[in-house]
Amino acid sequence: MRFLLVAVVAMMALVSSSTAAVAETSNDINTMNNNQEFARSLRNTEERSIAAILAEAGEEDRAAWRINYRAWYKAKLTPTQVKTVLGVSQAEMNNVAKQLQRLYLGYYSFYTAMEKKKEEKKRLATP
């Protein structure tokens, strides 16, 4: 009985190691396809918008930025010097400003529409 158990365990070890060796072999075509799929996934990722970044920014992040502001102010850096240190171009700043303006205008139109609905409900509710 013990001999049979040892034989079964040895056979299982032999079979499992042979399938592991087979699983590791791959040809160049599979590797190329995997690389193409990986490259495609990188191209399909969208850049995060300013709204998404602001939504994820917590109080800790904002506190860290305050610390940077204070350090820059104590170092007597002007805003143009900070822009140079950060490596931000004017075109990038304009793009960010446009995205923030779109975000604000979108919320403003949503807010005014909701307020108009509220006023309309209030007007219809009163006889």
UniProtKB/Swiss-Prot annotation:
GO CC entries: extracellular region; host cell nucleolus
Secretion signal span: 1-20
Keywords tagged on the record: Host nucleus, Secreted, Signal, Virulence
Keyword Secreted included in the entry's annotation: yes
Domain of life: Eukaryota
Motif (RxLR-dEER): 40-62
Region (WY-domain): 72-107
Quaternary structure annotation from Swiss-Prot or TrEMBL: Forms an unusual trans-homodimer. Interacts with host UBK.
Function: Effector that suppresses flg22-induced post-translational MAP kinase activation in potato and tomato, but not in Arabidopsis. The perception of highly conserved pathogen- or microbe-associated molecular patterns (PAMPs/MAMPs), such as flg22, triggers converging signaling pathways recruiting MAP kinase cascades and inducing transcriptional re-programming, yielding a generic antimicrobial response. Does not suppress programmed cell death triggered by the P.infestans elicitin infestin-1 (INF1), or by co-expression of tomato Cf4 with Cladosporium fulvum Avr4.
Protein name, as recorded: RxLR effector protein SFI3
